[in-house]
């Protein structure tokens, strides 16, 4: 039994780290990038299919043009320039992967780097519009807060 353990550890050291290849609904990333929009839309959930069937209007197309330009202007191996937008309802498409988008949350622009896992989601899902409540801390607005502040 002692002889088996060194073989297992040696095999584990020799084995290289392999990363899971990304796929969206069973289609790999390269195929998604080459896929026509009509075929791509069929992979999306019904709400997004309905939205895409109505077509992209001027504002979303302008955002996609700016993203393309930012990617072309970026030097090789560098991240593209941030493109700011108020279009929180824009659906993330495979073409947008690798771009950096500043999504407005009502106060500031939150920078989001688009990753393959974000395909089919809205930009708004990654830019929260409120500050989450932190309960139980004494201070402004808490009832009887002076009771819980330690004396120095």
Swiss-Prot record:
It is found in: Cytoplasm. SUPFAM superfamilies: Ribosomal protein S19 (SSF54570). One of its GO terms (cellular component) is cytosolic small ribosomal subunit. GO terms for molecular function: RNA binding; structural constituent of ribosome. Keywords: Cytoplasm, Ribonucleoprotein, Ribosomal protein. The keyword Disulfide bond does not apply. Pfam families: Ribosomal_S19 (PF00203). One of its GO terms (biological process) is translation. InterPro entries: Ribosomal_uS19, Ribosomal_uS19_CS, Ribosomal_uS19_euk/arc, Ribosomal_uS19_SF. Belongs to the universal ribosomal protein uS19 family. PANTHER family: RIBOSOMAL PROTEIN S19P FAMILY MEMBER (PTHR11880), SMALL RIBOSOMAL SUBUNIT PROTEIN US19Z (PTHR11880:SF49). This is Small ribosomal subunit protein uS19z. It comes from Arabidopsis thaliana (Mouse-ear cress).
């Amino acid at each position: 039994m002692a002889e088996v353990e060194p073989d297992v550890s040696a095999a584990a050291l020799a084995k290289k780290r392999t990363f899971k290849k990304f796929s969206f609904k069973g289609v790999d990333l390269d195929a998604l990038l080459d896929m026509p929009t009509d075929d791509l839309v069929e992979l999306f959930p019904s709400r997004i299919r309905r939205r895409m069937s109505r077509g992209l209007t001027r504002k979303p197309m302008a955002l996609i043009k700016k993203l393309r330009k930012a990617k072309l202007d970026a030097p090789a191996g560098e991240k593209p320039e941030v493109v700011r937008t108020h279009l929180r309802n824009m659906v993330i498409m495979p073409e947008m992967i690798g771009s950096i988008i500043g999504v407005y949350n009502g106060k500031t622009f939150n920078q989001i780097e688009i990753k393959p896992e974000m395909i089919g989601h809205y930009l708004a899902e990654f830019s929260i519009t409120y500050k989450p409540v932190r309960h139980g801390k004494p201070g402004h607005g808490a009832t009887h807060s002076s009771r819980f502040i330690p004396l120095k």
